[in-house]
């Protein structure tokens, strides 16, 4: 049977990517780390928290001024790792669903926190779905293990902290005067953003871009959040965006419109990035040939462990990679930033959009993701 272009790309690249993932060791750690661990038990705790946003945040799906999150802790031999689940309402998780899931997590039966794969596989098997709740355990466990090793995760993975990219700052859909104000704050503020991300997908797309261009000419990225429904109009819009110094377009059309997204990618003068269409590792080969690249978010991928596997597989398939976030504290943003030295683009501004962060960690200096040398995910509690 004759294969179409998308199926050929998918099958030809998948074998190589799967082989590469199969070569990953199930245990990153030398015996000297494992053998020095005591035989204590891990204690797991969680509590609900609500992030207050600095501004009402509007995307194609909805608007909100708060984000429910769950804060997690794993304690072992006097050392505590911190984690987080960020749960924007439109994604389907909540304080109630996270409480139900996390109440089933029992880490007391594990004596060795370095058994990351086994522990996280068991967590994943508790129930389907719940990616953010699962990520909160994953992040806390990674933070704990990094602290026990006295190493940040970018160093454990062998990444160069000096190769982090610039991060975007997100401008949500809003009235022109608000957009102008947010844009001016972003480009003239202490972080010195060199690239902005613009939420589109409604009827005022061109007005949004033109309003921003009245303030600054810095490069832009665009996230349509599945808002465009006609592929011909989407292509016309992308050509117009290219003329206005846009670098790439995220999720141009609904994730269910697979053939239409593939057509847009084939005809687009800009890279397209799958976001809502790419949740976990299994989705990466499906996105190959449909999008130019993928947007990895810990709250979709169930955490750092699977996110790194997604990064490796996407690279083996020749795809572009960006690392993104939800509105989060510096805990989850710093965890995601550990992967940033290996991506093309970063969208790690979620902690900068909230007014009640309870951690300090990764910062933005002259527009660039700047990692700390603190062990684990690189955070301290405020």
Residue ranges and their predicted role:
Residues 1-4:
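N-terminal secretory signal peptides
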Residues 7-29:
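N-terminal export signals
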Residues 13, 39-51, 69, 77, ...:
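Flexible C-terminal active-site loop/helix
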Residues 24-55, 75:
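C-terminal segment of N-terminal export signals and the immediately downstream linker at the start
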Residues 38-46, 62, 75, 80-148:
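Metal- or metallocofactor-binding catalytic centers and their adjacent structured scaffolds
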Residues 72, 78, 137, 150, ...:
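Conserved, mostly hydrophobic/aromatic
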Residues 153-268:
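Metal-dependent enolase-superfamily TIM-barrel catalytic cores that perform enediolate-based chemistry
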Residues 256-261, 267-273, 277-348:
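Catalytic alpha/beta core domains of metabolic enzymes, predominantly
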């Amino acid at each position: 049977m004759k294969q179409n272009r998308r199926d050929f790309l998918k099958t030809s690249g998948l074998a190589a990517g799967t082989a590469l993932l199969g070569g990953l060791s199930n245990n990153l750690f030398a015996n000297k780390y494992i053998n020095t661990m005591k035989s204590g038990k891990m204690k797991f705790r969680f509590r609900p928290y609500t992030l207050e946003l600095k501004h009402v945040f509007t995307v194609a799906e909805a608007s909100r001024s708060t984000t429910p999150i769950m804060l997690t802790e794993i304690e072992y031999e006097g050392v505590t790792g911190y984690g987080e689940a960020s749960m924007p309402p439109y994604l389907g998780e909540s304080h109630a669903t996270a409480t139900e899931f996390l109440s089933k997590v029992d880490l007391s039966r594990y004596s060795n926190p370095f058994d990351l794969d086994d522990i996280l596989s068991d967590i994943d098997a508790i129930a389907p779905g719940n990616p953010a709740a699962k990520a909160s355990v994953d992040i806390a466990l990674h933070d704990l293990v990094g602290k026990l090793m006295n190493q940040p995760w970018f160093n454990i993975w062998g990444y160069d902290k000096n190769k982090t990219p610039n991060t975007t700052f997100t401008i949500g859909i809003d009235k022109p005067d608000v957009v102008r104000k947010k844009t001016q704050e972003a480009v003239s503020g202490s972080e010195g953003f060199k690239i902005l991300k613009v939420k589109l997908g409604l009827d005022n797309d061109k007005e949004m871009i033109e309003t921003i261009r009245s303030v600054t000419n810095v490069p832009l990225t665009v996230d349509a959040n599945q808002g465009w429904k006609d592929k011909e109009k989407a292509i016309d819009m992308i050509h117009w965006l290219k003329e206005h110094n846009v670098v790439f377009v995220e999720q141009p059309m609904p994730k269910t419109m697979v053939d239409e997204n593939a057509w847009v990618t084939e005809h687009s003068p800009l890279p397209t990035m799958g976001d809502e269409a790419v949740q976990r590792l299994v989705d990466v080969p499906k996105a190959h040939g449909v999008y130019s690249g993928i947007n990895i978010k810990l709250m979709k991928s169930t955490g750092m462990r699977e996110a790194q596997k997604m990064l490796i597989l996407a690279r083996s398939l020749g795809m572009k990679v960006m690392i993104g976030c939800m509105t989060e504290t510096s805990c989850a943003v710093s965890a995601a930033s550990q992967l940033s030295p290996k991506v093309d683009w970063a969208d790690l501004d979620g902690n900068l959009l909230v007014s009640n962060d309870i951690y300090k960690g990764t910062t933005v200096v002259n527009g660039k993701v700047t990692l700390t040398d603190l062990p684990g995910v690189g955070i301290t509690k405020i």
